Curated annotation (Swiss-Prot):
SUPFAM superfamilies in the cross-refs: Cytokine
Record carries keyword Cell cycle: no
The family this protein is said to belong to: Belongs to the heparin-binding growth factors family.
UniProt keywords, alphabetically: Developmental protein, Differentiation, Growth factor, Mitogen, Secreted, Signal
GO molecular function: fibroblast growth factor receptor binding; growth factor activity
Principal location listed in the UniProt entry: secreted
GO-annotated cellular components: cytoplasm; extracellular matrix; extracellular space
Protein name in the entry: Fibroblast growth factor 3
Originating organism: Danio rerio (Zebrafish)
Region named Disordered: 31-54, 151-176, 219-256
Amino acid sequence: MVIILLLLLLSFLDPSLEESLAPRLTRTPRAPCARGQACDPRQRRDAGGRGGVYEHLGGAPRRRKLYCATKYHLQIHPNGKIDGSLEENNPLSILEITAVDVGVVAIKGLFSGRYLAMNEKGRLYASEVFNRECEFLERIHELGYNTYASRHHATTQPPPTGSGIGGSKRRASSKRQWYVSINGKGRPRRGFKTRSTDKASLFLPRVLANKDHEMVRKLRESQRHHTGSHRAPVGRAERRRRRHRGSKGHNRRADI
């Protein structure tokens, strides 16, 4: 009798034990790793930059104004000029900052349509198209400001030589970054003359004010109106051609 009771108890306990142990025993299947690539169990981001460990890449651009510690707003002109402005609501100072790689951003003027760039001589200019000179390393400074250094242009310092046990040992050469900088007169400084600790190289990303958002809204409306005005004549011409074809066909049928 006791044995029968034990068997009945075990039969009642078995389903509950299986249900409690099922989540522990089942494992999430991992995606197969490609040959020659390191296996990463974390989710990878897709082509649009959504999901995964690189979720912050490839998203919508941040609309900001870069306020320099010298009290100037960085602005990008349509003619390719770069300088600073003391005006609070200057449309040329409204920028779009987009991440293009880990810690690398592209800065575009919303109203000028040009990209901030630095050439091999350390001069800032506004490029019509995005190129490698438009890539900047974005770093957060200890004072709360951001610095923006050219990704591809820097000063290569000669490696110092030191005496060792087996003779002289050469150290690896170091590079000094070239930073985006606006001096106290609102003019850009050459990259090789800048330092990360310079006041002119520190920028505070500011969110847009209500007046800035209003200017952006008007810009979008004017762009839509401009696009629609170009499409309208094409539509009217097409309608005229269709009416002309229809009238020709009607006249031919009448002659027959």
